[in-house]
Amino acid sequence: MKKKEVVYQVFTRLFGNTNTTNKPWGTIEENGVGKFVDFSTEALSEIKDLGVTHIWYTGVPHHAVINDYADYGISNDDPDVVKGRAGSPYAVKDYYNVNPDLATDPSKRLEEFKELIQRTHNAGMKVIIDIVPNHVARNYEGITNPEGVEDFGASDDTSKEYDVNNNFYYIPGEAFKVPEWKDGYLPLGGDNNRLADSKFEEVPAKWTGNGSRLAQPHFNDWYETVKINYGVRPDGAKDFEELPEEYRNKDYKAHFEFWKDKTLPDSWRKFKDITQYWLDFGVDGFRFDMAEMVPVEFWSYLNSNIKMKNPDAFLLAEVYNPDLYRDYIHQGKMDYLYDKVELYDSIKHIMKGYGWTDHIPVVQKGMADIEHHMLHFLENHDEQRIASPDFAGNAQLGKPAMVVSATISTSPTMIYFGQEVGEPGAEDAGFGKPTRTSIFDYIGVPHHQRWVNNKKFDGGQLSEEEKELRDFYKRLLNFTIKSEALMGQYQEIHFYNKDHTEGYDHRVLSYVRWNDNEKLIVISNFDAHKAYSFGLKVPEEVISKWQLKDGKYPLTEALYGELKTNMSISNGQGQVQVELEPLQSYIFKVEN
């Protein structure tokens, strides 16, 4: 039987960095960097033991970076079109290689990554990497392309704004200009660099990654990247066939057959070749950046090709428009999408002390037909850390939220490295500002470093509270990947208890999960200050589905196993006496 999956997102260059200097805009020598080799057998074993099935190694493909690798045949990147000193992982410079910063020997960087994949597989986990089909770095340059592979734009007709087989869009007759810097910003914080001269040669100028058609994009545009052309004309018309409506209900094999004999834009083939290369390399899946900015037909083509090679590939996409979710799942053949705009945003609102838990069952009801495809998370590299003052200000507030996020549906759960030890992301790293761990700079991750403990990976420097928090995550995640009920049915009992249970409150949430072999009652208290005592009611409808008769049924709390109580069923309705401390959750297992 299929069980829950748990993704551990890790920012690869930060994971093993033990340097604590944390100088804003600091160099690799000053602030340090983590390496592939830091993911030792011991480190991976600890991650696996946390309850993890997949690791998303963020920032692996070779992206623009301010570091001199000329001795390895790599051109220097221009700080005027790089965000931060270490560079954004979403401005990929060479799709057939990996970030040289991550290797102990940059000339052997691909071999070192292959060894990491092998270690990860040996530890019993699968490997996910980023693919960013919407845009590439302004200075894209593949220096290790496989035979027959040419760079993006190499054969483009740059005299045209658009051509179906151009990889980029152009602004003919105009040269690219670096944005006007705002709010005192200077590349590298004003540090000397011979290339930081407010110039970057690009003639003609290309459209920018976020779709800006200006030769001089704005400071808040994705000016370090250029937009990929998928055969969508500047007026939005499509120069490729659209999928017939009935393909919503067809499998990836039918999608693969549909595209097999079609004439397709060149960019489609280029990205298909890139993903096939990494599958052959040993990667088990991809996280697709800004997927909704790329036409859904391309995803049908790409993902059906991926699944033909590896039917078990894990395909996760960043999509933020709920109106498009079903298109990207059914037509685009994505396995999973971020559940940010609905569930994450609702839970964050409650964690910040606003709003009622009532909205959560409403969200789940609206997602009922696609709930398995909506990946749940409370942190990732784009979002604020739970412990940061702009979010909850205290990692403990993540506990009830995490229980709900990880147990309310059959979808995978994702956590971000450091979340399990309450990392607040408090550093001013340079381009990256506090509340998020910087994805642009060389920086240390202090709470996480205490767990790393000089690469013993044993939590030796953690405080008691941090150890307890990590233990909570470990218990919860391990429970979720073993539980059969969490892949079964769901029913909320929250509104019934709001209407019928004295002492129940809108800061509490309750629901049941079950299959033939396991029945669970989940209750969470989101209130940081108030305890609640009430007789939780399990409605007749649930008891009937569970086929339980009147009488007493023992309950065991599943995470810690210490609390044992009973559910009394009388006249077909169940009742459980519950004493909930602030921020406490119970997952009760019904013992038949």
Task: Locate the predicted segments by residue.
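Short, well-ordered coil/turn segments that N-cap beta-strands
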Residues: 4, 51-53, 123-125, 282-284, ...
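Hydrophobic faces of well-ordered beta-strands that scaffold small-molecule active sites
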Residues: 6-8, 55-57, 127-129, 286, ...
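N-terminal structural segment of carbohydrate-active enzymes
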Residues: 1-126, 134-145, 149-159, 163-164, ...
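Substrate-binding cleft/loops of secretory-pathway carbohydrate-active enzymes
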Residues: 137-147, 296-308, 319-350, 424-432
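Short, acidic/polar
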Residues: 33-47, 263-279, 398-402
